[in-house]
Regions:
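N-terminal export signals
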Residues: 5-26
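C-terminal segment of N-terminal export signals and the immediately downstream linker at the start
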Residues: 21-49
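Active-site mouth loops of central-metabolism enzymes
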Residues: 52-68, 124-138, 181-183, 267-273
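Conserved, mostly hydrophobic/aromatic
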Residues: 69, 87, 157, 217, ...
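Glycine-rich, proline-tolerant flexible connector loops at the mouths of alpha/beta enzymes
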Residues: 83-102, 236
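Alpha-helix-loop-beta-strand connector modules within alpha/beta enzyme cores
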Residues: 95-120, 255-261, 311
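Active-site beta->alpha loop and helix N-cap motifs at the rims of alpha/beta catalytic domains
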Residues: 105-106, 110-184
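Catalytic alpha/beta core domains of metabolic enzymes, predominantly
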Residues: 158-286, 290-292
Length: 343
């Protein structure tokens, strides 16, 4: 598509939007800041993201091999995790290789915990994305989900709908050339994920890095497009990190206002630091949400199990139960046949 035709498409889309007269409503006193619910009847979804980009060189507690990932996932599930998310850190433009890395890591977990909620990350390579200034096409970046679901291993997959820059500011307050890359998804990625969920019954973990990502979620929720078994992970980062809102109550309140009136399960997460050192973990618990922990988010922190134990202490103080196993699948309404509890 040439530039003129592209601009014509954008203008036409703008005209359609204007004609639809869909606008955000005003803020009200009935927002989720005053959200009332029975704590004992509203379970917490405790997700543990056991690995990310951090290596053993940075933190010896990080699991890296398939055997280590499997062992760590099993330990976290034994300790009461609702969901385990993992990165094998073996991305490949050969989708079969990317799939096999997760098969090796997830198979022992599925055998030990048949009702576990497990999901992989997208198939992406930051070094390649930095070099090429673009992402892999959808059939590569999201092509591993279906084979993992067909194998009965991943009963949840990632539904990411936008673009976010990932970098730490340098001493001049600039995004440095070295290490910068952008994490992003095309409509084709979303179609692959939603089609996989419709056909195989996977739930989705939906990342929200910016308000625009949440607008995508709201649009799909209103249209009835979100798959069953969906939950949101709303991410924050401090002022030293490019992208994402700071971890302050006002930022979370914005997101909660955006989803007001929608029946969505949601959690908060913090990039590169401890979510429990911010007001957001307790705020989420007191408003019916959850929060996630683990070495993907707080890569330099204590072990996954130690982060879990601290999280459980806070959850117990607030007075809400943690949902696990088959009950978690029913609570999230994940229709994935291989792990759906029998009636």
């Amino acid at each position: 598509m040439n530039r003129r035709k592209f601009l014509e498409t954008v203008v036409a889309a703008g005209a359609t939007l204007a004609a639809s007269r869909v606008f955000a409503g005003p803020a009200t006193s009935g927002m989720r800041s005053n959200f009332a619910f029975k704590k004992e009847d509203t379970p917490v979804i405790l997700e543990v993201a056991i690995s990310g980009s951090t290596t053993k060189k940075v933190n010896p507690a990080v699991p890296e091999t398939a055997a280590e990932l499997a062992d760590e996932a099993i330990k976290c599930l034994d300790a009461g995790a609702t969901i385990v998310h993992a990165h094998t850190n073996k991305p490949s433009d050969n989708v079969a290789k990317a799939v096999q890395a997760y098969v090796d890591a997830f198979t022992p977990v599925r055998k030990k915990h048949p009702h576990a909620i497990l999901y992989p990350t997208a198939n992406f390579d930051p070094a390649v994305y930095h070099k090429n200034r673009t992402v892999w096409p959808p059939e590569i970046q999201s092509g591993h989900y279906r084979p993992l679901a067909e194998a009965g291993l991943a009963n949840m997959i990632l539904l990411d709908t936008g673009v976010v820059p990932l970098a730490v500011y340098d001493k001049n307050g600039m995004i440095p050339q070295k290490g910068f890359w952008w994490y992003g998804f095309w409509p084709g990625d979303n179609k692959i994920v939603i089609d996989t969920c419709k056909e195989l019954g996977c739930g989705t973990s939906i990342s929200v890095f910016e308000p625009g990502w949440m607008k995508n979620v709201v649009a799909m929720a209103r249209a009835g497009t979100l798959p069953r078994g969906s939950k949101l992970n709303i991410y924050f980062a401090d002022y030293g990190f490019a992208g994402m809102a700071p971890p302050i109550p006002e930022a979370l309140q914005l997101y909660l206002h955006m989803i007001e009136g929608l029946d969505l399960k949601w959690s908060v997460g913090l990039v590169a630091h401890d979510i429990m050192d911010t007001p957001l973990a307790r705020m989420a618990l007191e408003r019916g949400g959850s929060f996630r922990v683990g070495l993907e988010d707080w890569g330099r922190g204590p072990s996954n199990l130690e982060q879990m134990e601290r999280a459980k202490e806070l959850i117990n103080k607030v007075g809400r139960p943690i949902v696990t196993g088959a009950e978690a699948i029913k609570y999230l309404d994940i229709p994935f046949a291989a792990t759906r509890p029998k009636a």
